[in-house]
Amino acid sequence: MNLLRKILFPFAILYGLITSIRNFLFDKGILKSTSFDLPVIAVGNLSVGGTGKTPQIEYLIRLLSNKYRAATLSRGYKRKSEGFVLADENSNAEILGDEPFQFYQKFPDVQVAVDANRTNGITQLLSQNVKPQVILLDDAYQHRKVKAGFYILLTSYDDLYADDFMLPTGNLRESRSGANRANIVVVTKCPKNLSEEKQAEIRLKLKLSCSQQIFFTYIDYDVEIYGKDEKISAAEIKSESKLLLAGIAKPKPFFEYLKNENDECLTFPDHHHFSDADLESIQNKANGRKIITTEKDYVRLKDSKLVSQLYYLPIKSTFINHQQNFDVSILQYIKENLEP
């Protein structure tokens, strides 16, 4: 913890008090939460920064989309539109935000919507001619004006919420006790070979109740990288000199997976809007080499002048074990709460 964060500790106490009072008021029904007559699954985290929400939402889409009419509802962080927007063929990353646009590009049969007001967003989705049967709320763990029926809490293996502090001293949006709302906790970005003993140790550390399930996932990188008109073996590209580009919260694993000693790594803030000056600088740094980026960044850059050099590496969230138990829990919740 750096000195500035230590100095700000009194503000962390104040912020923790404010969020605890807010949660208490929602828990007691003094502040209103709206429920809906269909399965609503909220996915989120206690901390700011990347815990792997996007690949977790994509896992749920793959699980559900062949069985139910699924929809995703996101805030659409840093988008240039306002209010409720339902993705269509005219949508792009500026209208939807990068992550929702990625969902729309990959899963065209799924309704993808954005609205900072999640209550209004769900109401709008339910007013469509084709109504969803289940709604996935992206990054909505603290959005308590909607009472979801099922909560999935994500926490990174190398940054567990049990080891963190409230903002601004740490990165927690609310106190650790907020984890009590979760039906399922997923520890993301684990080592692929994480032992059962270490898994048990983490469960004890997180102090979960008997009714809460815990699962462990790792980042599963694709074996190929993809450009506009071609795909290349990821193993082959590792040996080439290239420019690695990332505008995500925690780019280190991406860089480490692809980097060799001849590569240059270029970072931008999460959800960064690339200016013409940025594009010019990136092109100059690449100097004719391939530019490899994340899938989330690619959706913001694919229509730029970089496209002929630009490639992305897809990732997905893969369970270390007990995947079937996770699937059964989700499907059982939906089955029990689906309107006949």
UniProtKB/Swiss-Prot annotation:
Its EC number is 2.7.1.130. Pathway: Glycolipid biosynthesis; lipid IV(A) biosynthesis; lipid IV(A) from (3R)-3-hydroxytetradecanoyl-[acyl-carrier-protein] and UDP-N-acetyl-alpha-D-glucosamine: step 6/6. The gene is lpxK. GO terms for molecular function: ATP binding; tetraacyldisaccharide 4'-kinase activity. It comes from Flavobacterium johnsoniae (strain ATCC 17061 / DSM 2064 / JCM 8514 / BCRC 14874 / CCUG 350202 / NBRC 14942 / NCIMB 11054 / UW101). InterPro entries: LpxK (IPR003758), P-loop_NTPase (IPR027417). The keyword Lipid biosynthesis applies. Transmembrane segments: none annotated. One of its GO terms (cellular component) is plasma membrane. It is an enzyme of class 2 (transferase). This is Tetraacyldisaccharide 4'-kinase. The lineage of its organism: Bacteria, Pseudomonadati, Bacteroidota, Flavobacteriia, Flavobacteriales. GO terms for biological process: lipid A biosynthetic process. It comes from the Bacteria. The keyword Nucleotide-binding applies. Keywords: ATP-binding, Kinase, Lipid A biosynthesis, Lipid biosynthesis, Lipid metabolism, Nucleotide-binding, Transferase. HAMAP family: LpxK (MF_00409). ATP binds at S47, V48, G49, G50, T51, G52, K53, T54. Belongs to the LpxK family. Transfers the gamma-phosphate of ATP to the 4'-position of a tetraacyldisaccharide 1-phosphate intermediate (termed DS-1-P) to form tetraacyldisaccharide 1,4'-bis-phosphate (lipid IVA). It catalyses: a lipid A disaccharide + ATP = a lipid IVA + ADP + H(+).
